[in-house]
């Protein structure tokens, strides 16, 4: 499994089979790709929205049910694919209204290369991973001393958490190691940075070679987005090139999720209002004109244009223009939506007024 058993919500059906509430979306998407796109050879892109459930009783204040919005890119191993997904995550966060955030990028293979060179067993590597990911320097030191790891490898592993910052940190990371696996991991990050510069999102990213995950299926680049107002990452993701083979399909993959609950909390604390589409249409209708208004709304929705129907406020100015102006004013005061245009269906068999709305 990808999640520790103690963190799962388990149930039993009538036959005694164990059922588990979904703790993580990535394996579900991997299974979906393997089942429904087994013979597909071109890159596959997914997006999804749903809830995950994790028993986090030991973490006070952390939600046990969270809503996640995610995207996955299957069957594309290139560094350009890494850049595409990170850039997409950045743009998604920006479109929500978030402005001050930073994406930390790491590389799982850098850490694994050091552990392999040092000859660490799987149990020691897992324990070391937990200490490094939680920035527990003393835990790392105590573990290495207890396991009698060679002094030169101890010095390297104790410095991993210091390898963070701008692209200059990658040069320090290369100078620290000599094994090919770790060096290739850093070179991949250098290529990734060049791709992100092409996307124009480099100011949002930094590097952290001590960034690791409790999920062991990650095989390459890993990233998390942080902002102020919440204590955890509002978005996270990474490359998982070996996961799909457990479902019968050999395919590389990379993806990310935005933790919607944490993002909304951050926006609220930062007093940011999510940006909404401003290409919609407001349709105001007087008594007896609902059918005409609905017909117009259907026409717009077929064209993928959001249309919002609202009945006219009673007691408005007796003139058609006065009623229209009053209704639009009330709508603006009570709604945070931003409509581009408004239609007003006048009483009885009157006509329809159309006007562009001032969205400032």
Which ranges hold each PLM region?
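Glycine-rich loop at the start of a catalytic domain that most often binds anionic cofactors/ligands
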Residues: 1-6, 10
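Glycine-centered secondary-structure boundary/capping sites
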Residues: 1, 97-100, 113, 119, ...
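Positively charged, Gly/Ser-enriched RNA/tRNA-binding surfaces
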Residues: 6, 15-16, 26-39, 46-98, ...
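Short terminal or interdomain "cap/linker" segment that borders an active site or interface and mediates
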Residues: 103, 108-143
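Short, glycine/charge-rich beta-strand/loop segments that flank catalytic centers
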Residues: 44-55, 102-113
């Amino acid at each position: 499994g990808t999640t520790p058993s103690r963190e799962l919500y388990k149930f039993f059906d009538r036959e005694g089979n164990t059922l588990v509430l979904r703790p993580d979306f990535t394996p579900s998407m991997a299974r979906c790709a393997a089942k429904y796109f087994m013979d597909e050879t071109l890159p596959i892109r997914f997006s999804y929205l749903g809830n995950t459930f994790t028993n986090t009783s030991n973490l006070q204040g952390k939600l046990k049910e969270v809503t996640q919005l995610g995207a996955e890119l299957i069957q594309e191993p290139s560094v350009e694919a890494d850049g595409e997904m990170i850039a997409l995550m950045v743009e998604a966060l920006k479109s929500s209204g978030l402005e001050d955030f930073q994406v930390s990028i790491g590389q799982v293979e850098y850490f694994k290369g050091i552990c392999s060179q040092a000859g660490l067993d799987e149990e020691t590597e897992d324990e070391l991973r937990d200490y490094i990911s939680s920035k527990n320097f003393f835990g790392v030191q105590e573990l290495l001393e207890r396991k009698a790891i060679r002094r030169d490898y101890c010095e390297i592993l104790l410095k991993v958490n210091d390898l963070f910052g701008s692209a200059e940190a990658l040069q320090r990371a290369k100078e620290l190691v000599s094994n090919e696996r770790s060096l290739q991991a850093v070179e991949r990050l250098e290529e990734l940075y060049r791709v992100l510069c092409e996307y124009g999102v480099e100011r949002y990213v930094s590097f952290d070679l001590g960034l690791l995950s409790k999920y062991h299926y990650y095989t390459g680049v890993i990233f998390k987005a942080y902002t102020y107002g919440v204590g955890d990452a509002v978005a996270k993701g990474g490359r998982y090139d070996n996961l799909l083979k457990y479902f019968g399909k050999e395919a590389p993959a990379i993806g990310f999720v935005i933790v919607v609950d944490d993002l909304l909390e951050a926006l609220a604390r930062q007093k940011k209002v999510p940006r909404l589409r401003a290409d919609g249409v407001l349709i105001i209708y007087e008594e007896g004109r609902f059918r005409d208004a609905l017909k117009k709304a259907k026409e717009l929705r077929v064209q993928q244009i959001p249309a919002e129907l609202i009945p006219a406020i009673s007691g408005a100015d007796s003139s058609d223009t006065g009623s229209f102006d009053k209704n639009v004013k009330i709508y603006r005061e009570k709604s945070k939506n931003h409509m581009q245009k408004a239609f007003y269906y006048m009483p009885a068999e009157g006509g329809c007024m159309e006007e562009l709305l001032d969205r400032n």
